[in-house]
Each structure stands twice: as C-alpha cells, then as structure tokens.
C-alpha cells in the first residue's frame, strides 16, 4: 500500500455570519463577511500543498438555506480546483445542509462523491486501498442512530467512516442529531471515524481514531481558539499521524485580567497591554475578536464602573497599538471593592467599628423607617411590596456601615 495523506474537515458553514461584530467599520465588516470563504480557500490550498489523495467533508458545508446561490457556486469552484490537482472529495450532508434547498442539486465536478441519503454506502479508492463509508442526512432533525447501519469493514483496506453526529460525551450544547457512542464506533471495525457536527476539536479515541476536527472558522465568542482541519498521514496502511492545521481567518479569544494588584488605572492598562500582546502573538498574525473580562477586588472598581465607555475606548486604543488588527467584541466588568482593611491599631480599630455600628444604628433607623413609610403610602392598593421593603430594611443599615468603614479605611490609607 502506498503512503499518502488526506484531510478531514467539517462544519464549513460557508457564508455564515460572524455574530457580535456587526456595526464595526466598513472595512472590518467586509473582512468578517468573507471569513468563511477565506477559510475554505485555505482548506483547498492546504490539500493541494500537502499533495493529499482525498478530502473528507463530514457535513454542514452550508449554513442552512442558501442566502445566495453564489455560495454554492463558490463551493463548486473549490471542488474544481481540488479536481484539477488530482484530489478526490468524499462528503456527506449534515443537518444544516438538509435545510438547504440547493445542497444536493449543485452540479459537482467528477472528483466529488456525495454519499446518498437513503442508506449508508461505501466508496473504494483502490489505488490506496481505502474504503470510505458514509451517509447524508435525509432530513435536518435526524434523531436516529444511523451509525449502527454503516456497512461492515472491508477486509484488506483502510476503513474510514464519515458521520455527522452528536457522539455521547462530546455534544456540548449541540443538538443530539444521529446520536451514537464512542464505544459503538470503536467496535465497528473501522480504522478512522471522520466526525462532524460538534464545533470543538476532539480526539475521542486513538484505537481506532475517532475524531472531530471542529469547525473551519469560529463564528462567535463561544467558538474560541484555533479552528481548521485535520491532516492525516497514512503509512504502511495504518494511520500514522493526525495533525490539526489552523485555517481560520479571524480568531476569537476570551481573556480574563485580574485587576486586584492595581490601584492606578494607568498602571493597570500597562499591565493589560502586556497580556493583550501575548494574545495577539498566539494568533499568528490573524485578527483577534476579543471578549475581555476584568475581574478582581480593586480600589478602581467605582471608577471603572462609572467610566465603562471611556475604559472601553482605552482598551480599544491599546489593541490598536499591537501588531495586526484586533477588536474588542465585548468588555465584561466583574470587579469589586476590596474588603475594608483595618489600618489602625487593633484595639482602636475594634472600638471604632463598634462605634460605627452604634452610630449607624441610631442615625439610620429613624430616617429609614420614615422613608419606608413614605414609600408604602405611595404604593397602589394591593401592591405586594412587603418582601421588597423588608429587604431594604435589612440591607440599608448594613450597606451604610460598610460604606462608613470603607471611608474610614480610605482616610487611614491616605494617612499612611
């Protein structure tokens, strides 16, 4: 048997919009709109550059119903380029493709084999002693286990199953279409299962290989990290290596920054820039769509919260200073005030805390009760506000005491 390579890809979702990045600059919007096509082009170019014998596409080539028939024509042109390079394509249609009116009506080039919908069938590639088994979805909401009906392994060949499935333990928040289990697939006698549907890259087993390549291009903030396809090398009739190759055009990243060590915003932003530079470096020159969470207990909490828009502008400015083009998709503020520190002599601090509690109790109680009475008088008859009022009665004195301690603590820090 000759040695060769093949590519396993899935979930191309051609022309799928990237969510959460609308309303950016016109230049950015046009780049985002083209991201799935450019990732597809990268797939075609990788197969040609690596001299692959064939490409496996494990479903969801399209993103539901075609918004533009040009999407289908673009895909066919990519198949033609592979054919010109002597590369076969074996593909199945997934749940999104089955929602598409044109997916099974496109006039494919001769190098493309689309597995039928009625039943799982086999396709032989005699020159490399490979048998590929697969089945397309007959409808989008396929809930049956179709893997059990895949043909038995063909003796004397490398057997590959192509399946669009929510395999148990890896489905995440994906719909449970064509469910199966890794144990079931492992017992089928195939050498490699080329799976699709789940957008997270995963190798469920290596004996045999049961593999999700993940999707080709991340589409929103939950699809982070490198996206692409699997490049598989076959030597002496056996799977030798399975290597992920990143093909995405825009990289989604979720970052968390701990602000607890900072009480000066300029210093905080300097440290944040260092972190963001590392994020940009890991993207290998790709634009990064960033969801940033700033967390931790910091004295800056009130200022950051009250000046969120200005903070966002500062972070966008930081991103603009980095090499490449990067965007802040969302800023999440999860900071808090640090607990009030006792900066005085312990005996003095204890007496001061007790005095604060006494003064708050005496000063707030009367004012609070009068104010609650006014609120009750303004409520319409029958309003069920007792729980709300009791919560206010409980919370306000506590918050007043916390604020008083915080102010005293700040004075103590200032005195240091």
Question: Language-model segments: what does each one mean?
Answer:
Residues 6-8, 56, 160-162, 194, ...:
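Structural motif
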Residues 37-48, 76, 147-151, 269-273, ...:
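Amphipathic, non-transmembrane alpha-helical secondary structure
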Residues 19, 25, 54, 65-211, ...:
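His/Asp/Glu-rich metal-coordinating catalytic cores
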Residues 8, 116, 134, 212, ...:
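Structural signal for conserved beta-strand scaffold positions within catalytic alpha/beta enzyme cores
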Residues 3, 51, 189, 286-288, ...:
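Short loop/turn motifs at secondary-structure junctions
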Residues 1-71, 391-397:
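N-terminal active-site segment of His-dependent metallophosphoesterases
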Residues 3, 119-126, 213-278, 291-293:
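Binuclear metal-dependent phosphoesterase catalytic core
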Residues 247-416:
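Accessory, non-catalytic peripheral segments of nucleic-acid enzymes
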């Amino acid at each position: 048997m000759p040695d060769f390579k093949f590519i396993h890809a899935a979930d191309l979702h051609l022309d799928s919009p990237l969510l959460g990045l609308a309303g950016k600059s016109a230049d950015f919007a046009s780049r985002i709109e083209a991201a799935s096509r450019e990732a597809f082009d990268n797939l075609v170019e990788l197969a040609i550059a690596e001299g692959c014998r064939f490409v496996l596409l494990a479903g969801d080539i399209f993103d539901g119903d075609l918004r533009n028939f040009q999407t289908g024509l673009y895909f066919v042109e990519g198949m033609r380029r592979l054919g010109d390079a002597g590369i076969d394509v074996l593909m199945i249609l997934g749940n999104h493709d089955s929602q598409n009116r044109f997916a099974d009506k496109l006039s494919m080039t001769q190098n493309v084999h689309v597995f039928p919908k009625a039943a799982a069938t086999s396709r032989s590639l005699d020159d490399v002693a490979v048998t590929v088994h697969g089945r397309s979805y007959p409808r989008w909401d396929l809930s049956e286990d179709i893997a059990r009906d895949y043909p038995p392994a063909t003796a004397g060949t490398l057997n590959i199953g192509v399946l669009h499935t929510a395999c148990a333990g890896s489905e995440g928040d994906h719909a449970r279409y064509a469910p199966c289990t890794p144990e079931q697939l492992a017992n089928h006698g195939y050498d490699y299962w080329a799976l699709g549907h789940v957008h997270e890259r995963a190798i469920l087993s290596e004996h045999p290989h049961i593999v999700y390549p993940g999707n080709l291009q991340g589409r929103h903030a939950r699809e982070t990290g490198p996206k692409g396809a699997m490049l598989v090398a076959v030597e002496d009739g056996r799977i030798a290596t399975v290597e992920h190759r990143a093909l995405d055009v825009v990289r989604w990243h979720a970052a968390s920054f701990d602000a607890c060590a900072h009480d000066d915003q300029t210093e905080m932003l300097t440290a944040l820039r260092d972190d963001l530079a590392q994020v940009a470096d890991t993207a290998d020159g790709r634009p990064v769509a960033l969801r940033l969470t700033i967390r931790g207990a910091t004295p800056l909490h009130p200022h950051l919260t009250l000046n969120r828009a200005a903070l966002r502008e500062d972070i966008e400015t930081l991103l603009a200073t980095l090499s490449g083009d990067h965007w802040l998709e969302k800023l999440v503020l999860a900071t808090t005030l640090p607990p009030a520190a006792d900066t005085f002599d312990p005996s003095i601090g204890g007496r001061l805390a007790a005095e604060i509690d006494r003064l708050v109790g005496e000063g707030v109680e009367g004012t609070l009760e009068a104010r609650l009475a006014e609120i009750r008088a303004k409520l319409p008859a029958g309003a069920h506000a007792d729980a709300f009022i009791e919560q206010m009665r409980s919370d306000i004195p506590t918050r007043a005491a916390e604020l008083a301690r915080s102010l005293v603590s700040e004075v103590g820090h200032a005195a240091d």
